[in-house]
Curated annotation (Swiss-Prot):
1-deoxy-D-xylulose 5-phosphate binds at residues 114, 134-135, 158, 181, 194, 199-200, 203. This is 1-deoxy-D-xylulose 5-phosphate reductoisomerase. It comes from the Bacteria. Mn(2+) binds at residues 133, 135, 203. NADPH binds at residues 7-10, 31-33, 113, 115, 187. It comes from Helicobacter pylori (strain Shi470). Pathway: Isoprenoid biosynthesis; isopentenyl diphosphate biosynthesis via DXP pathway; isopentenyl diphosphate from 1-deoxy-D-xylulose 5-phosphate: step 1/6. Belongs to the DXR family.
Length: 368
């Protein structure tokens, strides 16, 4: 298989599962962590390797693997690969082209890159995509019982780093505090997206594209991250999916569902320790961006605006140019600005053009 973003949290776990399942690695790609990809090359001996920046070529030790550079290089590498499975764990809109290229070359796409569906779900062949996500894996598992007719899909949120922070202190928080996730060990972007609830807005849009626009879609807070998803059926019964907070479960099913179902990749749950499970509504006072959930479901192509504004604000937030309130304000202003715009977005070029436009318009934000 091919692992894009092999040095990140998902990529490292994917390689762990590949080793366990004895799946060969044809190609790897990374952003900046050349030291780690060099280690991965030694262990997995890929035939092809892609890195983002040509300045890193000197430090790369490909050990005979063919080397590709940049986003265009990743596209070319995917095209040359004979593997029928691509794991796309590239962070941000940078992973969008790789998703398109994987599907264009008739590969199955195991998708951890949320931005692909958020920005271009209407252009992707959903039948060839397996989401690498605990919530969507949970929904998929719950929807296997075809005898029951689903009415609404509910995903859970942990509440992120600021779930107990006094409301008046949230706007002045910095990136260091936002990165203290209570339950998961993840990359910096998704951890901050959890604090802002942008991650859950992304997942709501992913649910829309993956499982059908006709169903009611919502989210709630479940602090322990044990309940990942719930489905309410037409008979008013509800079934929940419970599992340890470990991404190896959805990754293993994305790589090989048969082997994943026969051997455990996560710790068993201690049912007697589950007395603390409690569901809470997502407070719009605490998570002000949550008020855009219905707008995004009514006009899901606004996902391009949500993602682009979030990425430019995130960069400034991580660079300590703005506080958390500035990040929220940037995204709010962008969504308000485009709320009534009818989008066509009939191909990838139009999606990327809107993405660039939003970045240019909202790239300079006020310090808050």
């Amino acid at each position: 298989m091919v692992v894009l973003g092999s040095t990140g949290s998902i990529g490292k776990n994917a390689l762990k599962i590949a080793k366990k399942f004895k799946v060969g690695i044809e190609a790897l790609s990374c952003g900046k962590n050349i030291a780690l990809i060099n280690e991965q090359i030694k262990v997995f001996k890929p035939k092809k390797v892609a890195i983002l920046d040509s300045n890193d070529l000197n430090g790369l030790e490909p050990l005979g693997a063919k080397v590709f550079v940049g986003l265009e290089g990743i596209d070319a590498m995917i095209e040359e690969c004979v593997s029928n499975l691509v794991i796309n764990a590239i962070v941000g809109v940078a992973g969008l082209r790789a998703s398109f290229k994987s599907l264009q070359t008739n590969k199955k796409l195991a998708l951890a890159n949320k931005e692909s569906l958020v920005s271009a779900g209407h252009l992707l062949d959903i039948s060839q995509i397996t989401p690498i996500d605990s919530e969507h894996f949970g929904l998929w598992a719950l929807l296997q019982n075809k005898a029951l007719k689903p009415k609404s899909l509910i995903i859970s949120a942990s509440g992120g780093a600021f779930r107990d922070t006094p409301l008046e202190l949230i706007p002045i928080q910095n990136a260091q505090n936002a990165l203290k996730h209570p339950n998961w060990s993840m990359g910096s972007k998704i951890t901050i997206d959890s604090a802002s609830m942008v991650n859950k807005l992304f997942e709501i849009l992913e649910t829309y594209w993956l499982f059908g626009a006709s169903l009611k879609i919502d989210a709630l807070i479940e602090r322990s991250s044990i309940v990942h998803a719930l489905v309410e059926f037409e008979d008013n019964s509800i079934i929940a999916h419970l599992a340890s907070a470990d991404m190896q479960l959805p990754i293993s099913y994305a790589i090989n569902p048969k082997l994943a179902s026969l051997s455990a990749s996560i710790k068993p749950l201690d049912l007697y320790a589950l007395s603390a499970i409690k569901f809470e509504p997502i407070s719009m006072e605490r998570y002000t961006l949550w008020r855009y959930k219905d707008l995004l479901l009514e006009n899901p192509k606004l996902g391009v605006v949500l993602n682009a504004s979030n990425e430019v604000a995130m960069e400034k937030f991580l660079n300590q140019e703005i506080a958390f309130g500035g990040l929220i304000k940037t995204i709010s202003q962008a969504l308000e600005s485009y709320a009534k715009t009818p989008f066509k977005l009939s191909d990838l070029d139009e999606v990327l053009a809107l993405d660039r436009e939003v970045r240019e318009r909202f790239g300079s934000v006020a310090r808050v």
